[in-house]
Amino acid sequence: MYWCYHCYAVNPRSTGPCVRCRGPVDGPPGLSYDDRLIWALGHPDGDRAVMAAQTLGARGVRSALPALRRAVEEDRDPYLAVAALRGAIAIAGPDELHDWLEQLAHSESFMVREVAQRAIA
């Protein structure tokens, strides 16, 4: 089973055209491990996306900050939003993210709200 780099569809082969979008299944050549983790933030399998957010935070990947912020703000999965927020805090620290955390401290998501409030306390 192989995931399409462009649309995340499951494909029977690691190369060639995607069964859904017809784009190439494989990603661009030379992607770094960090780039693949950033890609995985959009993965439809929530566990993979959460693991990617946690790993990006643990690795301190600053280039992932915009993607992590999007994952929080899109709020398509509350567990991903929390993992992405924690990852962003681990990378940049609460001082650098203070204004954003202040906004998130009033989020509709109680999970995001709690993490943001703890970070600025």
Predicted regions and their residues:
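Amphipathic alpha-helical scaffolding segments comprising HEAT/armadillo-like alpha-solenoid repeats
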Residues: 1, 28-40, 61-74, 93-106
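Short, flexible, mixed-charge glycine/proline-rich loop motifs
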Residues: 1, 8-13
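Short cysteine-rich clusters marking metal-coordination/redox-active sites
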Residues: 4-7, 18-21
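Alpha-solenoid repeat junctions
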Residues: 25-29, 56, 60, 88-93, ...
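Alpha-helical segment of the N-proximal tetratricopeptide repeat
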Residues: 36-61
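Short inter-helical turns and helix N-cap capping residues of alpha-solenoid HEAT/ARM repeat scaffolds
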Residues: 44-45, 76-77, 108-109
